[in-house]
Amino acid sequence: MGSQGIRIAVAGGGIGGLTLALALRQRGLRAEVFEQATQLAEVGAAVALSANATRELRRLGVLDELAAVSTEPTELIYRNWQDGRRIAAHPVRKDGRYQERFGAPYYGIHRADLQRGLSGALGGEGLHLGHRLASIEDQGDTVGLTFTNGHSFEADLVVGADGVRSMVRRFVTDGEGTVYSGTSAFRGIVASDLGPRTSDLGKHDHD
């Protein structure tokens, strides 16, 4: 079978899955993307796209559209979390050296806008919403996918881009689920003048 005839299934229609589908299509390969959500909703928060990402998004032909819904910071400022004291700064747009050095811009974008831009570039081609993966079966030369909606798909290659609770990973690792690392991270936004007053709210905040 030539590479053009390979049936590729991507489990997960997030940032990784959609970007992969676009990259494969640019190389003449079609991937079917199966996403459990019935619609691509506005979930998540800000995503930082440094030059290694924006360079590839430009190559995929989607950077200009994404730039319209992105911000390009003047500089990245690092502050002490307790008193707001400035520790360091990394110029981005301020002196123009970032693009000069890396050949692409640094953007901040909402995850939903990034996902929407990627799915829009696919034009709906090969994107199947409402497909929650139920089981994977090794059929020798092919892999059988079954979804909770009763649909099935036979693929020559399956890519797992289905997140932290990946069904594909459980299949590959013989049922092993996620393993807690012992570390959690929480994020939020507060007004800058509230920083010193809110820095001690978290339990074990000095650990």
Predicted features and spans:
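Conserved N-terminal helical subregion
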Residues: 2-8, 52-196
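Conserved hydrophobic helix-helix packing surfaces used for dimerization/oligomerization
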Residues: 8-10, 31
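N-terminal Rossmann-fold NAD(P) dinucleotide-binding loop
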Residues: 17-18
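Glycine-rich FAD pyrophosphate-binding loop
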Residues: 25-45
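Conserved N-terminal glycine-rich FAD pyrophosphate-binding loop of Rossmann-like flavoproteins
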Residues: 38-58
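Active-site substrate-recognition segment that forms the wall
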Residues: 203-207
